Amino acid sequence: MEFPRVSPESVGVPSQAVLDLLDELYRYGIEMHSFMLLRHGKVFAQGHWKPYNPQTPHAMFSFTKSLTSTAIGFAVQEGLLSLDDRLVDLFPDKLPEEPSENLQKCQVRHLLMMGCGHATEIPNLGQDDPDWIATFLHHPFVYEPGTHFLYNTAGTNLLAAILARKTGQTLTQFLKPRLFEPLGVGDVHCHA
């Protein structure tokens, strides 16, 4: 999909407003590699700073969390899983011998809201742990799911693992026809 290019004024944005935005970003020391501004599905401003260009891949880090939640939304919409699916039902082979009451209550929705019930994040989970899903599920679920927020990268990775278990596809494979191709996004790799 190629977005049409138009002048800022044609979509109701003064060109000076775009220039003012760029001046403000510079004034505050915000380093931009590239930008694209759209309104009503039309690109009205776009730019790249050397050495970057539209083909330069970028590490997006936590943006993958947004992609993961988008994928879960597609999967729910397609009936492949439910927000009410419980972790104990999704990973019965990875559970502690006696799952806690809080773990038994934990659902996909709680992972999406970063409220699974952990009191602490598990540092570097998955980097050197071949059974990181079991490690996640064995970590104490101190709080009732949905009652305590904890920024939790491992929970997002678990959502990607749920997607893989339910669909047989990686996050990137699942999103390619649903999101990346329709948006014209080419070479993309999601680490989750």
Language-model features, listed with the residues they occupy:
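Extracellular/periplasmic catalytic domains that process cell-envelope and extracellular macromolecules
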Residues: 29, 102-105, 128-129, 142
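Short, compositionally biased leader-like segments
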Residues: 1-14
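Catalytic-site signature segments of enzymes, centered on catalytic residues
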Residues: 54-55, 118-192
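Active-site helix/loop module of the DD-peptidase/beta-lactamase fold
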Residues: 59, 78-116, 138, 167-192
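Second-shell loop/turn segments in exported
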Residues: 6-9, 96-99, 145-146, 161
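Active-site SXXK
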Residues: 41, 58-84, 111, 159-163
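Aromatic- and histidine-enriched alpha-helix N-cap/loop-to-helix transition segments
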Residues: 61-67, 103-106, 149-157
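A short, well-structured edge-of-sheet supersecondary motif
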Residues: 17, 21-52
